[in-house]
């Protein structure tokens, strides 16, 4: 009886957690929040400024840091880029220090003092009435992310 109830519960609840159409969108949002948190910690530990350069057209995130000579370099011995799934695109990025960027390249700076500008990244999958949006708000004092369904502006 217990096994039957567990099976019934799993059958009813698992589809609620994993929606095929939204899985790439949510997976990319989690990847972005994980990368930001990792670079936030790396900046605090190493004492070097880090940044993420986001190419909005290609959905590519380049991860960089300032070396001892003051030059920007890709993160070594680790993945130094993040690319979004083909189904997912960046609608725009708003940052406290640079405003809203809807095309081209946006730069997210992460400072070694344990701070980054408040930032909101808007992701979208699909088009027309079937499009889905996610808003990722990056918190300045912790590097943590709040992920919300829909298109939200957290600025102000």
Cite the ranges covered by each PLM segment:
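N-terminal helix-rich module
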Residues: 8, 12-34, 41, 45, ...
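N-terminal signal-anchor/signal peptide hydrophobic helix marking the start
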Residues: 1-4
């Amino acid at each position: 009886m217990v096994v039957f109830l567990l099976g019934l519960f799993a059958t009813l609840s698992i589809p609620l957690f994993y929606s095929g159409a939204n899985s790439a969108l949510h997976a990319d949002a989690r990847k972005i929040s994980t990368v930001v948190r990792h670079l936030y910690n790396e900046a605090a530990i190493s004492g070097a400024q880090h940044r993420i350069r986001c190419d909005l057209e290609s959905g590519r995130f380049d991860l960089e840091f300032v070396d001892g000579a003051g030059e920007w370099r890709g993160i070594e011995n680790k993945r130094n880029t993040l690319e979004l799934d083909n189904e997912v695109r960046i609608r725009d990025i708003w940052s406290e220090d640079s405003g809203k960027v809807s095309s081209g390249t946006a730069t997210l700076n992460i400072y070694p003092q344990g701070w980054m500008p408040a930032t909101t990244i808007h992701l979208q999958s699909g088009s027309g009435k079937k499009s889905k949006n996610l808003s990722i708000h990056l918190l300045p004092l912790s590097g943590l992310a709040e992920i919300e369904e829909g298109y939200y502006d957290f600025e102000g």
